[in-house]
Amino acid sequence: MARIGDGGDLLKCSFCGKSQKQVKKLIAGPGVYICDECIDLCNEIIEEELADADDVKLDELPKPAEIREFLEGYVIGQDSAKRTLAVAVYNHYKRIQAGEKSRDSRSEPVELTKSNILMLGPTGCGKTYLAQTLAKMLNVPFAIADATALTEAGYVGEDVENILLKLIQAADYDVKRAETGIIYIDEVDKIARKSENPSITRDVSGEGVQQALLKILEGTQASVPPQGGRKHPHQEFIQIDTTNVLFIVAGAFAGLEKIVSDRVGKRGLGFGAEVRSKAEIDTQDHFAEVMPEDLIKFGLIPEFIGRLPVVASVTNLDKASLVKILSEPKNALVKQYVRLFEMDGVELEFTEEALEAIADQAIHRGTGARGLRAIMEEVLLPVMYDIPSRDDVAKVVVTKETVQDNVLPTIVPRKPSRSERRDKSA
């Protein structure tokens, strides 16, 4: 044990050698002592190392082509949306990196403003999955919020600050890490005001929510209640800066295509105008031609649109794309169910016609890729119920008839092993 012998035995720090009279606190361990000054020094070293680790991650930011290539492994189709998202996400985190470096620079930096993303497109086409895959690749906190549950502060429903609480929870309450995360707000089209004219009456779940979202979208120091706010009014607030949080807001925007079609169709009026048939106008990708004026007419306020400068559109998935989604991505549904059956020692096979029939059903139901799993569950339910109780099945083959006519899948029996045949003959 470390001691000083002049004028009586005094305990001293095992690290710096200072006596208990020279420091404020001396903490004892098994045979060692550490003072408060050495503890502070250790904390500073740890914080510096963690900050250096964060800088390394930013330096290793993947390029747009690498981001798009990663998305290709999980999401089928939607090439335009992938390219738009890849560039927007790269620029966003490059902006954060530039902000970190400018703190150490004496020159006056050019301030880079944030570019949040608006995603348009029908349900079941991959909007949410694209955002989830991006967050997975970048290893940043990710939170999903439903805009329909939000209301203005003081009304029944969720405050917009609850969105930030979900992000903080996803970061395990590491606020610094949460401040570079991604928030995905779905169903944003449901908070559009009822008309493009400003409302005289209070619209607490529409225009009111858009107004409430403006500050956090732009970047502000927000006070977030750790337990949800309204039920616990006296709790301490968590402070979070949303300046570097990337917001991706999305919606199906049903009816927007007609607004775009009407505007695009007017180009055919007057001398020298391009004349196009109604069929040509109807068959084009309307969401790719969306302008701010269309979104205002739909019911989004100009200030809200102004904070979403990047627009990415997804299109309806055709039959060929749905078949690819079933079998090609790294975590494709077919691969997932094949693995489930492997756990029971059974091989699972889908014929090409069966996959096409599943895609046809998803198109007929209008559920897109989101409805594929439900159809697969319906098709495989009878055999998934029976297989665990049987040991005579080697293979299950799902055919077109299984999907269309509710016929049971073809079951290939397992050949008995030599020992089983010997036991049976005996």
Curated annotation (Swiss-Prot):
GO MF annotations in UniProt: ATP binding; ATP hydrolysis activity; ATP-dependent protein folding chaperone; protein dimerization activity; unfolded protein binding; zinc ion binding
GO BP, one annotated term: proteolysis involved in protein catabolic process
Residues noted as binding ATP in the record, renumbered to the chain: P122, T123, G124, C125, G126, K127, T128, Y129
Binding site for Zn(2+): C13, C16, C35, C38
InterPro entries named among the record's database cross-references: AAA+_ATPase (IPR003593), ATP-dep_Clp_protease_ClpX (IPR050052), ATPase_AAA_core (IPR003959), Clp_ATPase_C (IPR019489), Clp_protease_ATP-bd_su_ClpX (IPR004487), ClpX_bact (IPR046425), P-loop_NTPase (IPR027417), Znf_CppX_C4 (IPR010603)
Annotated ranges, domain ClpX-type ZB: 1-54
Subunit structure, as described in the record: Component of the ClpX-ClpP complex. Forms a hexameric ring that, in the presence of ATP, binds to fourteen ClpP subunits assembled into a disk-like structure with a central cavity, resembling the structure of eukaryotic proteasomes.
Protein's UniProt name: ATP-dependent Clp protease ATP-binding subunit ClpX
Organism, as annotated: Mycolicibacterium smegmatis (strain ATCC 700084 / mc(2)155)
Highest classification ranks of the organism: Bacteria, Bacillati, Actinomycetota, Actinomycetes, Mycobacteriales
